[in-house]
A protein has these predicted regions:
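Juxta-kinase regulatory segment immediately upstream of eukaryotic protein kinase catalytic domains
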Residues: 2-45
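Active-site-adjacent loop/helix micro-motif of nuclease/hydrolase catalytic cores
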Residues: 71-83, 122-132, 174
Length: 181
């Protein structure tokens, strides 16, 4: 019996939305317009967010990401880094901090699927969030793996627990601030 979990639903969604985005999927503005057209045609409310190198298509229960930065395509992109880092977190026992990322290859492109989480809706740094404090062990693990961009747009909560959703690493050292808030 085939499961109908968020990953399976995301794969079906990718197959359905791909014709809308394939023409210019490495341009975030074009993807945004294509998703608007998809929403009209299928009466959906799918959102698009993008950063410096990745596009995230957000539905009600999952997120589909892909790299669009030319350097990311030629080298290991941020989405692939997230898969590698998640695997390392599983090995080290820190996977509870992260949304699981899985890869789905379709029509020669790699898409990355993760569950949707509840955002916090206001700008807060994960290290000083009033409702959650990372342990020193968790901070040390994040520092050792160059996770330095953990602001409110990159994490949220799932089932009452913190969940990091954007965890591609940045190659530089970071000094922890032990300030009280």
């Amino acid at each position: 019996m085939k499961k109908n979990n968020y990953e399976v639903r995301a794969q079906k969604f990718i197959q359905k939305v791909f014709p809308y985005i394939e023409e210019d999927m490495f341009n975030p503005y074009s993807v945004e317009k294509a998703i608007d057209k998809f929403n009209e045609d299928f009466h959906r409310s799918v959102k698009v967010h993008y950063g410096d190198a990745r596009i995230a298509i957000i539905t009600s229960d999952y997120v589909v990401k892909f790299d669009y930065d030319s350097e990311s395509i030629e080298e290991i992109g941020g989405c692939e880094q997230e898969i590698e880092l998640y695997e390392q977190a599983v090995e080290d026992g820190f996977d509870y901090l992260f949304a699981k990322t899985s890869r789905y290859d379709y029509e020669g492109y790699s898409f990355y699927i993760m569950p949707k989480i509840n955002g916090i809706g206001q700008y807060k740094n994960i290290y000083h969030h009033a409702d959650y404090y990372m342990t020193y062990e968790e901070k040390d693990w994040c520092d050792a793996h160059n996770l330095t961009d953990l602001h409110c747009n990159n994490y949220g909560f799932r089932k009452g627990k913190v969940c990091i959703v954007d965890y591609a690493f940045i190659e530089h050292e970071f000094e922890w601030e032990d300030e009280e808030y």
